[in-house]
Design a protein with these regions (language model features):
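Conserved mid-domain beta->alpha element of the FAD-binding
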Residues: 88-89, 116, 186-187, 207-296
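Glycine-rich, phosphate-binding/catalytic loops in enzymes
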Residues: 100-107, 154, 248-251
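Conserved N-terminal helical subregion
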Residues: 1-102, 106-119, 170-173, 180-185, ...
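Short, flexible helix/strand-to-coil boundary loops that buttress conserved ligand/catalytic motifs
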Residues: 14-15, 101, 202, 244, ...
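Glycine-centered loop/turn positions within well-structured domains
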Residues: 58, 67, 95, 140-142, ...
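C-terminal helical "tail/cap" subdomain of flavin- and related membrane-associated enzymes
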Residues: 8, 244-245, 260-350
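Conserved FAD/dinucleotide-binding core of flavoprotein oxidoreductases
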Residues: 10-35, 73-82, 106, 121-210
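Histidine-centered metal-chelating micro-motifs
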Residues: 95, 115-117, 139-143, 237-238
């Protein structure tokens, strides 16, 4: 990962995955491809009818032995009640399960940033595997990174890009929706001159087949996910700003820990409580941290001190400041590497 100012000046770089010392690589993958991989795996293990679509969750009741979910088939209008040992609400930012658990919760909180995202096939940038972060979220910022090894093998890159713009008007005038279509003419003016020897960002946006637009929102952390035989997972449990690749990654970790605790406990209610205990506080800390990331503070400082760009980052940040950035990063990263590499697997004993 390499951080640049808005003019293309290199600020600092951070290794990732095996380059940092982890036992495992770091992957960036198309969300739809990952979802289809998971769908295929679920059907292979649980049967073709294990996943149902077009069904609306309308509520639940529970007692000491089971939970009953009320469902509605969108196409036929048929109502149905399904009983189970546990109910996991993994239904996103507008979670209906969470709404029943927290009926008085206010609307999602917006930080004033509007975000446009797209995917474009293009020539590789920098090493071909680099994640680029450029600009400042105090004004405008972009993130670009490759998400397909198949495209890489053809000498091309499938680049996922995000463009952030902080607006003067902090009123959220539409309902947050991860699938709202965006318009090139709305975002292009903010980045019309973001062109560099190795990246033409206006062209990258213009060549995307589809653009999505949404506000950067989260919710305040809650002090409980699990209620008896019902729990929350992913954005339903901890919606956070999409910073640091944490949104989807934390949902995957939720699922991994949940599966481990359910298998280890042998009792659904106990497993849900153990999952809540293991995950909630660490993830709530990430939700709060995403509101004020140290990396974003550095990018903002550079943009304030050198609004027209710089020749050398040493002219903008003092040696002590650079050492503080790299030292804090190393301390956090390498301690995490050691802990993760030595931690027992979440795979439950069979």
């Amino acid at each position: 990962m390499v951080h640049f100012d808005r003019h293309g000046g290199r600020i600092w770089a951070e290794p990732r995955g095996r380059a940092l010392g982890y036992h495992w690589p770091q992957y960036s993958i198309h969300r739809g491809e990952l979802q289809m991989m998971l769908l295929d795996a679920v059907r292979a293990r649980l049967g073709e009818d294990a996943v149902r679509t077009g069904t609306v969750f309308e509520g639940f009741e529970q007692d000491g032995t089971q939970v009953r979910a009320r469902l509605l088939d969108r196409a036929s209008g048929t109502a149905e009640t399904v009983a189970a040992d546990a109910l996991v609400g993994a239904d996103g930012l507008h979670s209906a399960v969470r709404a029943q658990l927290y009926p008085d919760e206010p609307a999602p909180l917006w930080n004033g940033i509007r975000l446009w995202r797209g995917i474009t096939e293009a020539d590789p940038i920098l090493t071909g595997r680099t994640m680029v972060v450029m600009g400042s979220n105090a004004t405008s910022k972009i993130v670009v990174y490759p998400i397909s090894m198949r495209t890489e093998r053809r000498g091309r890159a499938l680049l996922n890009w995000a463009a952030e713009v902080r607006l003067a008007d902090d009123r959220l005038d539409w309902d947050p929706d991860w699938n709202k279509a965006g318009r090139l003419e709305d975002v292009l003016p903010y980045f019309a001159d973001w062109k560099y020897d190795w990246l033409d960002f206006p062209a990258l946006m213009s060549q995307a087949a589809e653009i999505l637009e949404y506000p950067m929102v989260d919710r305040d952390p809650v002090d409980r996910w699990t209620f008896g035989r019902v729990t929350l997972l992913g954005d339903a449990a901890h919606p956070m700003y999409p910073i640091g690749s944490n949104g989807g990654s934390q949902a995957i970790l939720d699922a991994r820990v949940l599966a481990h605790e359910l298998a280890a406990s042998g009792d659904a209610a106990e497993g849900l409580l153990a999952y809540d205990k293991a995950r909630r506080e660490p993830v709530n800390a990430i939700v709060r941290a995403c509101r004020d990331m140290p990396a974003d503070r550095v990018l903002h400082t550079v943009s304030q001190r050198a609004p027209q760009g710089f020749t050398s980052i040493e002219d903008v940040l003092s040696p002590d400041e650079l050492n503080t950035i790299s030292g804090a990063y190393r301390q956090t990263s390498f301690s995490d590497v050691e802990a993760l590499n030595s931690r027992p697997s979440y795979t439950a004993a069979r």
